[in-house]
Amino acid sequence: MAHPMQLGFQDAASPVMEELLHFHDHALMIVFLISTAVLYIIVVTVTTKLTDKYVLDAQEIEMVWTIMPAVVLI
């Protein structure tokens, strides 16, 4: 039964719906892990003081391009 202010799916009424709920949970976990890994890499890249003379200073825009899809997915 669905409840007001419920964030997830309602209770499954069939075996197919139960499998769909498991798939949804699994897919969200994968998205969360990928987003966390990308965020960690961005934080490490931005906070480290090591630079390469061939790297252009466009890290801010690259960071935005990488973070925006994660924000949209959330």
UniProtKB/Swiss-Prot annotation:
Domain of life: Eukaryota
This protein's UniProt keywords: Copper, Electron transport, Membrane, Mitochondrion, Mitochondrion inner membrane, Respiratory chain, Translocase, Transmembrane, Transmembrane helix, Transport
Localization per record: Mitochondrion inner membrane
Catalytic activity: 4 Fe(II)-[cytochrome c] + O2 + 8 H(+)(in) = 4 Fe(III)-[cytochrome c] + 2 H2O + 4 H(+)(out)
Main location: mitochondrion
UniProt remark on cofactor binding: Binds a dinuclear copper A center per subunit.
Topology in membrane: Multi-pass membrane protein
UniProt record, GO biological process: ATP synthesis coupled electron transport
Gene3D superfamilies the UniProt entry points to: 1.10.287.90
Cofactor entry: Cu cation
Chain ranges on the Mitochondrial matrix side, renumbered to this chain: 46-74
Gene Ontology MF terms in the entry: cytochrome-c oxidase activity
PANTHER family named in the record: CYTOCHROME C OXIDASE SUBUNIT 2, CYTOCHROME C OXIDASE, SUBUNIT II
Function as written in the Swiss-Prot or TrEMBL entry: Component of the cytochrome c oxidase, the last enzyme in the mitochondrial electron transport chain which drives oxidative phosphorylation. The respiratory chain contains 3 multisubunit complexes succinate dehydrogenase (complex II, CII), ubiquinol-cytochrome c oxidoreductase (cytochrome b-c1 complex, complex III, CIII) and cytochrome c oxidase (complex IV, CIV), that cooperate to transfer electrons derived from NADH and succinate to molecular oxygen, creating an electrochemical gradient over the inner membrane that drives transmembrane transport and the ATP synthase.
Record-given protein name: Cytochrome c oxidase subunit 2
Annotated organism of origin: Amia calva
